[in-house]
Structures are given as structure tokens and as C-alpha cells.
């Protein structure tokens, strides 16, 4: 559907994006977004031609959240910072991880910011130059997203107040604890996984 011409809407694109994020970047409906703004759903078409365009605009907006601290001066710290910011983004917008992983277009709209991070990692001397930087960032980013999605069921409470981890412990009983599930915390083993990636890059395994 083409964007509709006519009177200037009583809201901004950013307000529509913020309403979308509040509704849930994966599950939002145009009607629910419009209701948050106090307008009819058809009014949104003056700014966005489709739900898909709005969703991708929201992804593009939150991609800014992963930009690392400009004061960091080693590629290792930049990579850690990007992962930390990516995790915080997922906590802030719980549906974002699944959208990013399952929508190739989402990676596309975030690519300019991702490219800038790759160039910074390369400039700071990550082994392998830009290719090594792209590999490490992709590996670490995927690890953060997948860890977030896999940990959530263990942290979420059911109607009786039991978490998925509580249920796991009850079923596992006295079996050996090989994966650190009971002590994984809200980030799982993410930090250890990222240090593993960094160590691999430092040792020239790329």
C-alpha cells in the first residue's frame, strides 16, 4: 500500500515507532499502535506503507542502542560492550531478539551501524582485519541473541510462581550438573561464551 497523501498527521514517525516498541516489536498490530496514539489505524499509512515497513523502522531505531562507547580503546572491550548493549536492548524490548533472528530484512536495516562497528574493531587491530571483525561480531551477536532467547523460559514464572529453572531442577533431581544450569543467572553463560570467542580471536583461530 502506498503512503497516503493529504493532511499532515497529528503524530511523528518517532511517536509511531515508540508506540510500536511499547506494544511489542514482534506482536504489535496497527490498530493497537493507533489506539496508543489516539488515532485511527488508517492514519498510520500517512507515515508507513505497511506493518512490515513500521517493524523495520523500529528495528532500525533500536539498532542505535548497540553502538559501543566511543571511549573504549581495545577491540576486546568494544566487542564486550556491544554484547552488553545488545543484551540490554533485548531486555528493554523482549520481542526484538526473535524478530532480528527470523527476519533477514532486520539485519539489512541494521547493517549501516553493524558495518561501522566492524570498521572500528578492525581499526583497533582485531586479528583478521575487517573479515575477522565481521566474523567475531557476527559470532558474538548471534551468541547474545540466542542465549537471550534460550534463557528466558528458565527465568519466566508460571501462574504458580515457579520458574522454568525450578521445573528443570525438580526433574533433573540428583543427576550430575554438567551445564551450570542452576547457577547460570539471568545472562546464562553469555559472558563466558564471549570470552571464549575473544580468546579464539587472540590466538589466531579465525
Tell where the protein language model's regions lie, with residue ranges.
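Short, amphipathic alpha-helix enriched in basic
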Residues: 2-32, 36, 60
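Hydrophobic alpha-helical connector segments
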Residues: 67-112
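Short alpha-helical scaffolding segments that buttress acidic/His motifs in well-ordered protein cores
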Residues: 58, 83-86, 100, 136-140, ...
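HTH DNA-binding helix-turn interface
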Residues: 23-25, 38-39, 45-55, 95
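Amphipathic alpha-helical packing segments from all-alpha helical-bundle domains
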Residues: 101-135, 145, 157, 161-171
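Amphipathic alpha-helical interaction segments
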Residues: 15, 81, 112, 116, ...
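C-terminal peripheral helix-coil segments that are non-catalytic and often amphipathic
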Residues: 153-206
Amino acid at each position: 500500500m502506498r503512503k497516503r497523501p493529504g493532511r499532515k498527521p497529528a503524530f511523528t514517525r518517532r511517536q509511531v515507532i515508540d508506540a510500536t516498541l511499547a506494544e511489542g516489536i514482534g506482536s504489535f498490530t496497527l490498530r493497537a499502535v493507533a489506539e496508543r496514539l489516539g488515532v485511527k489505524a488508517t492514519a498510520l499509512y500517512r507515515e508507513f506503507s505497511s506493518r512490515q515497513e513500521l517493524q523495520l523502522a523500529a528495528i532500525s531505531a533500536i539498532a542505535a542502542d548497540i553502538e559501543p562507547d566511543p571511549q573504549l580503546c581495545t577491540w576486546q572491550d568494544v566487542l564486550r560492550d556491544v554484547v552488553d548493549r545488545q543484551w540490554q536492548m533485548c531486555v528493554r524490548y523482549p520481542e526484538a531478539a526473535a524478530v532480528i533472528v527470523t527476519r533477514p530484512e532486520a539485519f539489512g536495516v541494521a547493517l549501516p551501524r553493524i558495518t561501522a562497528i566492524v570498521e572500528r574493531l578492525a581499526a583497533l587491530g582485531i586479528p583478521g582485519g575487517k573479515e575477522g571483525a565481521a566474523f567475531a561480531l557476527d559470532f558474538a551477536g548471534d551468541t547474545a541473541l540466542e542465549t537471550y532467547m534460550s534463557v528466558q523460559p528458565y527465568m519466566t514464572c508460571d501462574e504458580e510462581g515457579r520458574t522454568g529453572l525450578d521445573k528443570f531442577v525438580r526433574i533433573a533431581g540428583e543427576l550430575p550438573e554438567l551445564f551450570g544450569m542452576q547457577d547460570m543467572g539471568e545472562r546464562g553463560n553469555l559472558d563466558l561464551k564471549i570470552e571464549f570467542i575473544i580468546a579464539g580471536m587472540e590466538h589466531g583461530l579465525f
